[in-house]
Amino acid sequence: MHQKTVAEISAALHAGEISSRELTDSLLKRIEQFDPRLNSLITVTAEQARAAADAADARLRAGEAGPLTGVPLVHKDIFCTDGVATTCGSRMLEPFRAPYDATVVRRLAEAGAVMLGKANMDEFAMGSSNETSYFGPVRNPWDLDAVPGGSSGGSAAAVAARLAPAATGTDTGGSIRQPAALSGICGLKPTYGRVSRYGMVAFASSLDQAGPFARTAEDLALLLGGMAGLDERDSTSVDHVVPDYSESLNRSIRGLRIGVPKEFFGEGLDADVRSRVEAALQVLEGEGAELVEVQLPNMELALPAYYVIAPAEASSNLARFDGVRFGHRCADPQDLEDLYKRSRAEGFGDEVQRRILVGTYALSAGYYDAYYRKAQQVRRLVADDFRQALDQVDVLAGPTSPTPAFDLGERADDPVQMYLSDIYTLGVNLAGLPGLSVPAGFSRGRPVGLQLIGGYFDEARLLNVGHKYQQVTDWHKQVPEGFE
């Protein structure tokens, strides 16, 4: 049953072919057996999961179940979970237990989903490889010497290894789509405001968005339906109708115009990745879609703009972790200043400290206009490029990441090379658009992802295109060796 998709598991649960408790126990055994090789989970909530599974089975017997009732999943450890550790992959929050559930956690629990545990992640979601976690790096199920992508690498690795059929993640500059691509699964970054950020520990508030991981676009449709919608506790949540995302999955894509940005196929794109993505585009063309070359002339400016805006917002958001109210507190501080300095120096890792320093500098007097304000102006140019391109076509398509998964430690000492991992994804966050990554083959045994980008609140169309692609390909059915 661990090889089944969310949709298949849901059907089996409703047909009485298996109980949620049986499925949950089976997956908990898989986690115990396989996760020591991956380190994909920080916390396993076995007792809580079994209780939730029993409650789901009662709902199923009573005929009160929905499509996610009884379906196990893991949550990225950036979402607050009542009474369960929420660490953000950091020593700073190692002792933190939230007194409430994040809206994403609450909504999925109300839908009957069963939380198996909390997934490992780059510290405070800052990273592209899941190597910055205080709890150790996550390994890629396809190659244990490779990274799974980041920052939601634990979520992606758990789904790829069949430890859970689904997971939640967050995407600030590619942190759902990039690990989905590198781990050979599907990941959706919804439109900014589509899913509540309440209870999601903030990295960069104008960029962060929660979304789901699964092995198929069909599964993502079910998960997004359970997560999306207005939340009055999140001022950035948008009151926009939530459609039945499953309803439009099987629509024909004949005549659909797919824009192919030439900037996504330039210098820096791995030749194997280019070949796999071009083959995927030909598959969509074979299904009746029309490929149209488009331009995003300011895309080369997206990376430097992002790495001003995101650290600036992070430096503000992470100022709250000071050793006074919650989180790590240094021993025997001499005075308040010593408490601040040592608690933050001990609690934050190198990459987080680097970004706090960059962000503080960008916001400082005398540099605000030269850096932060200028970056926001570039952000508008990038968003305008996407708008103009999407005025000509229905969706955009290209590679999710410029390379397949790289080796653990390969880029640890080269921040710029690490940041370039997100060069095709972070513009979508600057613009606030939805983006989807689906498996598109392999390069030297490591997965490659196809990225689809849509207009605001057009997740249904992206899922439709992704589903039609997966109906005529089988990359999503491949299983990492040793995790069968």
From Swiss-Prot:
It holds the Pfam family Amidase. It catalyses: L-glutamyl-tRNA(Gln) + L-glutamine + ATP + H2O = L-glutaminyl-tRNA(Gln) + L-glutamate + ADP + phosphate + H(+). Its EC number is 6.3.5.7. It is an enzyme of class 6 (ligase). InterPro entries: Amidase, Amidase_CS, Amidase_dom, AS_sf, GatA. SUPFAM superfamilies: Amidase signature (AS) enzymes. One of its GO terms (biological process) is translation. The active site is at K76 (charge relay system), S151 (charge relay system), S175 (acyl-ester intermediate). The keyword Protein biosynthesis applies. One of its GO terms (molecular function) is glutaminyl-tRNA synthase (glutamine-hydrolyzing) activity. Keywords: ATP-binding, Ligase, Nucleotide-binding, Protein biosynthesis. PROSITE patterns: AMIDASES. GO terms for cellular component: glutamyl-tRNA(Gln) amidotransferase complex. Heterotrimer of A, B and C subunits. Belongs to the amidase family. GatA subfamily. Allows the formation of correctly charged Gln-tRNA(Gln) through the transamidation of misacylated Glu-tRNA(Gln) in organisms which lack glutaminyl-tRNA synthetase. The reaction takes place in the presence of glutamine and ATP through an activated gamma-phospho-Glu-tRNA(Gln). This is Glutamyl-tRNA(Gln) amidotransferase subunit A. It comes from Halorhodospira halophila (strain DSM 244 / SL1). The gene is gatA.
